[in-house]
Amino acid sequence: MLRSKLSSLREYLTPINHNSNFSTTGEISPEEFVQAGDYLVYKFPTWQWSTCPKNLQKSFLPADKQFLITRHVPSYQRASNYLTGGNVDFDDDEEYEDDEEGDGWVKSRKVVSVTKPQDGQEEEPQEINDIDDLIDVTAEGAEDDGDNLEDFDDLDIRNDGGSVRKYDMYITYSTSYRVPKMYLVGFNANGIPLTPDQMFEDINADYKDKTATIENLPVAHNTTSVSIHPCKHSSVMKVLMKHSKSKKTREEVNHLSEELGKTNISDKSQEDTGKDAEAAAGPEAEDSIRVDQYLVIFLKFIASVTPGIEYDYTMDAL
């Protein structure tokens, strides 16, 4: 717990910065953290603001908005099984996306999603190149699975003995890194707290040694948690915001191009129409990721660190 004490000391000694520069640095101020938390709670009511004992409260945050929490989030299988089982395979090639510091901490594998073949047809793999495509394919697969639930009335795969776990998830504000920080507190099927080693089983192996840490939960007394260390959160958030902004900009430009193509501007070439669409989308596209959406993108990142914990229902929030 030495690292936990050092982390607490660093949080205490770091002065509060109220300046806003999230779009350029990936960091947010305490006020922006509250704003992003309000948006998360509004969009996803399973997340709630909460208070903590007075001696643990941070004076720069409202007393009733010290941290965000969602409880009893299920985990049906361990991270290693989640990444190697089912219908999603990783090929041998790995892609690394370096942040601007060149640390290569944002790591992604090429993913091949195998679709269920029709009669007489072979399976055709669909390559997925970014996190949003993976989320979209996962959502489509969930819908397909829901259509076939009646075929499995007598089969309860998820509730397999003691494999089901529940997690309470806490999001606090880190003053030393100026980003949100995630804490996990897990319980087994009987409600008994998990040991740190057991909770580590639900952390992606690629991140275990880099970012997962055993700490005392800073908003409660005598509670052991696993934290997702925020040292690289800002650079990771910059990458994810860039991806989300790029995807949204492409969608807006394509939509505007289609709309302009329906108008009676006969002397415009297709290239000119595309330029007009980009110009029309420009200001909105530049600001497409708002600061209040920050925690939604943050959770997309955390979902890659804890792949077996099923809380990433944020696909349609942006």
UniProtKB/Swiss-Prot annotation:
<dbReference type="GO" id="GO:0061723">
    <property type="term" value="P:glycophagy"/>
</dbReference>
<dbReference type="GO" id="GO:0000407">
    <property type="term" value="C:phagophore assembly site"/>
</dbReference>
<keyword id="KW-0963">Cytoplasm</keyword>
<comment type="function">
    <text>E2 conjugating enzyme required for the cytoplasm to vacuole transport (Cvt) and autophagy. Required for selective autophagic degradation of the nucleus (nucleophagy) as well as for mitophagy which contributes to regulate mitochondrial quantity and quality by eliminating the mitochondria to a basal level to fulfill cellular energy requirements and preventing excess ROS production. Responsible for the E2-like covalent binding of phosphatidylethanolamine to the C-terminal Gly of ATG8.</text>
</comment>
<feature type="region of interest" description="Disordered">
    <location>
        <begin position="244"/>
        <end position="284"/>
    </location>
</feature>
<protein>
    <recommendedName>
        <fullName>Autophagy-related protein 3</fullName>
    </recommendedName>
</protein>
<feature type="compositionally biased region" description="Basic and acidic residues">
    <location>
        <begin position="249"/>
        <end position="261"/>
    </location>
</feature>
<keyword id="KW-0833">Ubl conjugation pathway</keyword>
<feature type="active site" description="Glycyl thioester intermediate">
    <location>
        <position position="231"/>
    </location>
</feature>
<feature type="compositionally biased region" description="Acidic residues">
    <location>
        <begin position="89"/>
        <end position="103"/>
    </location>
</feature>
<dbReference type="GO" id="GO:0032258">
    <property type="term" value="P:cytoplasm to vacuole targeting by the Cvt pathway"/>
</dbReference>
<feature type="compositionally biased region" description="Basic and acidic residues">
    <location>
        <begin position="268"/>
        <end position="278"/>
    </location>
</feature>
<feature type="region of interest" description="Disordered">
    <location>
        <begin position="83"/>
        <end position="104"/>
    </location>
</feature>
<comment type="similarity">
    <text>Belongs to the ATG3 family.</text>
</comment>
<dbReference type="GO" id="GO:0019776">
    <property type="term" value="F:Atg8-family ligase activity"/>
</dbReference>
<dbReference type="GO" id="GO:0005739">
    <property type="term" value="C:mitochondrion"/>
</dbReference>
<keyword id="KW-0072">Autophagy</keyword>
<dbReference type="GO" id="GO:0034727">
    <property type="term" value="P:piecemeal microautophagy of the nucleus"/>
</dbReference>
<dbReference type="GO" id="GO:0000045">
    <property type="term" value="P:autophagosome assembly"/>
</dbReference>
<feature type="region of interest" description="Handle region">
    <location>
        <begin position="235"/>
        <end position="293"/>
    </location>
</feature>
<dbReference type="GO" id="GO:0000422">
    <property type="term" value="P:autophagy of mitochondrion"/>
</dbReference>
<keyword id="KW-0653">Protein transport</keyword>
<comment type="subunit">
    <text>Monomer. Interacts with ATG8 through an intermediate thioester bond through the C-terminal Gly of ATG8. Also interacts with the 40 amino acid C-terminal region of the E1-like ATG7 enzyme. Also interacts with the ATG12-ATG5 conjugate.</text>
</comment>
<keyword id="KW-0813">Transport</keyword>
<dbReference type="InterPro" id="IPR007135">
    <property type="entry name" value="Atg3/Atg10"/>
</dbReference>
<dbReference type="GO" id="GO:0005829">
    <property type="term" value="C:cytosol"/>
</dbReference>
<feature type="region of interest" description="Flexible region">
    <location>
        <begin position="82"/>
        <end position="161"/>
    </location>
</feature>
<dbReference type="GO" id="GO:0006612">
    <property type="term" value="P:protein targeting to membrane"/>
</dbReference>
<dbReference type="GO" id="GO:0061908">
    <property type="term" value="C:phagophore"/>
</dbReference>
<dbReference type="Pfam" id="PF03987">
    <property type="entry name" value="Autophagy_act_C"/>
</dbReference>
